[in-house]
Amino acid sequence: MAGADELVQELDVVLMVQNLHAHSVFCDGKNTPEEMIRACLAAGMDSAGISIHSPLPFANGWAAKAENAAPFLHEMRRLKAKYAGQIAVYAGVEWDVLSDAGWLEPFDYAIGSAHFLPVGDDPEANPTVDDSPETTRCFLAEHFDGDSDAAAECYFGQLKRVADEPRAQIVGHFDLLTKFDERERFFDEASPRYRAAALDAMDALVSVGKIFEVNTGAISRGWRTAPYPSRWALEQLKRRSARVTISSDSHSTDTVDCAFGQTQALLRACGFEEIWAFDGETFRPKKIG
């Protein structure tokens, strides 16, 4: 086994591939698409995508407004032309399963995600799984009588719906509901019910060829020290010969490549030898550095 110094040196030489999960001021990001693309270029990437959150049929604080789609796509076309020959630029959408599927049409690629738990007739009352430890504690108590396995079954049942949408090539943050578990353990990932729900969704998604993103967003936000999915889930993905890609779920220029070296090392430790990168038309394998 490599020592700590050897591991650091190894991480330093890991080759950058691309980041397809990044948000801008067109939804809940802090920077313009051009600022994000320039940050990806400075990080050594030869291609990158900016993704806009799909609008939702109820009020919330982070999804894009429907009228933002056209100006976003116009700006992305401008950036594709401006940076041609320097970095390939792609326009993506992070599509929530509660959004209209028609929103998938004009984009180069789509990330399919679940953020909400459907717990009642009022969609605006549906809790978000990644808001805060306090809201997680509240929705578990209020809607699931403290039964975290029931909440996990609800969440993975939602995420499984991504399998039914062929235009969503990537599965976003597979186990997003565990975002806060390093601070306060809300979910028992070793529970038979939790694993059954997670693996049922995983099998459905793998069976239709979805690519699973290994997402470092909670690392940059200070909630986790490792990416989604958890290691046990990554090992299960490897057993199923699933395809994976790495993304930062970045909302600002300083996190576009957060923990990519660490994540590639983790994937190698789980037996992965390649990640899948988008080339503008399809996804192709790239050997992990």
Predicted regions and their residues:
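Hydrophobic residues within beta-strands of alpha/beta enzymes
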Residues: A48-I50, A110, V171, F212, ...
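His/Asp/Glu-enriched short active-site or ligand-binding loop at hydrolase and phosphoryl-transfer sites
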Residues: I211-G222
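Conserved, mostly hydrophobic/aromatic
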Residues: H21, C40, A110, H173, ...
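Extended substrate/RNA-proximal surfaces in nucleic-acid metabolism proteins
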Residues: W62, E67-S207
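C-terminal regulatory/interaction regions
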Residues: C270-E273, D279-G289
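An N-terminally biased module of ancient metal coordination in phosphate/nucleic-acid-related enzymes
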Residues: G3-V97, T178-R193, S241, T245, ...
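Charged helix-capping and loop-helix junction motifs
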Residues: E189-A197, A226-E235, G261-Q262
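Structural recognition of alpha->loop->beta junctions
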Residues: P106-Y109, A233, L237-V244, G261-A277
